[in-house]
């Protein structure tokens, strides 16, 4: 029969909180939580605790918020907790080798991709953006590299032609929680084998930036649609409509048909429920935008947007231009 492990948890955002919640509901004993220092948030820029801190405090856990784990005092504080294992999920601090060596069973990481594909900061969004048809979570034994440790457990989930970054995040977060509990249960009975990551198929998921969210309509329709879905809910894909930002929340590639090319970014005759935009290097492909947001407005289904503000979207207008019409 498996026994309970002493766990220290390190994580920061909502994605990490899902794993902490699963651990709190498991047979294992979470003895402390590590998370990023409180950050200013909201319009008032009020110091706000991370989702992991809020959850830990609800359950009466001691919370540690060091700015670094590289100094010996911080490492001694961690060592004094006498953890069997440190579980790390989207923590945001680099763990030096001295920290990785502290727990008896080392440090386990919940990573939101099928490693070795999409090591790095934004695996959920990059998988959708690249047109991947599957994603998942990998439980990894951490080493000093960037998401390079041996794999202990992998759980998959499909990516469909309509999956957004937010939807995949919300599916993977609880899946990560289930997987880390399963991994700890197995570790407690010596029933888990570490598999080195293959050297083939390594890709890196660069951190998202607002700068890359502006669409380039010379790109193919399937690529634009994937980018729109990947960047929902952040940083949100956008273009310029008569010089003003038009945010694009949902999109799909239109089935290719023989049609004359026009300048990429040109608004074509609208469908009742979609903005049809010419794209591709020769303007012969079409990307359909089905949910969008005008400045000062809220995201709307394009059907509702056209009913309310159809005059803003005349056929022939070219999107992505700096100048106002």
From Swiss-Prot:
Origin superkingdom: Bacteria
Report whether Protein biosynthesis shows up as a keyword of the record: yes
UniProt key word Transferase = yes
InterPro entries from the UniProt entry: Fmt, Formyl_trans_C, Formyl_trans_C_sf, Formyl_transf_N, Formyl_transf_N_sf, Formyl_transferase-like_C_sf, GART_AS, Met-tRNA-FMT_C
Concerning SUPFAM superfamilies, the annotation shows: FMT C-terminal domain-like, Formyltransferase
Its Gene Ontology molecular function terms? Answer: methionyl-tRNA formyltransferase activity
PROSITE patterns from the UniProt entry: GART
Q: Which family does it belong to?
A: Belongs to the Fmt family.
Matches recorded under PANTHER family = METHIONYL-TRNA FORMYLTRANSFERASE, METHIONYL-TRNA FORMYLTRANSFERASE, MITOCHONDRIAL
Q: What is this protein called?
A: Methionyl-tRNA formyltransferase
Q: Which organism is it from?
A: Chromohalobacter salexigens (strain ATCC BAA-138 / DSM 3043 / CIP 106854 / NCIMB 13768 / 1H11)
């Amino acid at each position: 029969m498996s026994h309970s492990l002493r766990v220290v948890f390190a994580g920061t955002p909502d994605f990490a909180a899902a794993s902490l919640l699963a651990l709190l509901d498991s047979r294992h004993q979470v003895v402390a939580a590590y998370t990023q220092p409180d950050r200013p948030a909201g319009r008032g820029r009020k110091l706000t605790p991370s989702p992991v801190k809020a959850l830990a405090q609800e359950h009466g856990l001691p919370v540690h918020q060091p700015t670094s784990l590289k100094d010996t005092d911080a490492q001694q504080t961690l060592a004094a907790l006498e953890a069997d294992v440190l579980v790390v999920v989207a923590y945001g601090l680099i763990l030096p080798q001295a920290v990785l060596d502290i727990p008896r069973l080392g440090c386990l990481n919940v990573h939101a991709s099928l490693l070795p594909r999409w090591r790095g900061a934004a695996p959920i969004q990059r998988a959708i953006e690249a047109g991947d048809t599957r994603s998942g979570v990998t439980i990894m034994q951490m080493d000093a590299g960037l998401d390079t440790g041996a794999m202990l457990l992998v759980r998959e989930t499909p990516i469909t032609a309509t999956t957004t970054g937010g939807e995949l995040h919300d599916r993977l977060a609880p899946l990560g929680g289930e997987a880390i509990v399963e991994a700890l249960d197995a570790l407690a009975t010596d029933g888990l084998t570490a598999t080195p990551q293959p050297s083939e198929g390594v890709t890196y998921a660069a951190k998202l930036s607002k700068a890359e969210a502006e669409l380039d309509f010379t790109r193919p329709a399937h690529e634009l649609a994937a980018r729109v879905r990947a960047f929902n809910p952040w940083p949100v894909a956008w273009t310029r409509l008569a010089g003003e930002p038009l945010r694009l929340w949902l999109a799909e590639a239109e089935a290719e048909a023989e049609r004359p090319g026009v300048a990429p970014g040109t608004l074509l005759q609208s469908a009742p429920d979609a903005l049809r935009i010419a794209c591709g290097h020769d303007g012969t492909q079409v990307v359909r935008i089905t949910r969008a947001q005008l400045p000062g407005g809220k995201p709307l289904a394009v059907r509702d947007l056209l009913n309310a503000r159809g005059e803003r979207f005349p056929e022939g207008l070219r999107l992505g231009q700096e100048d106002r019409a």
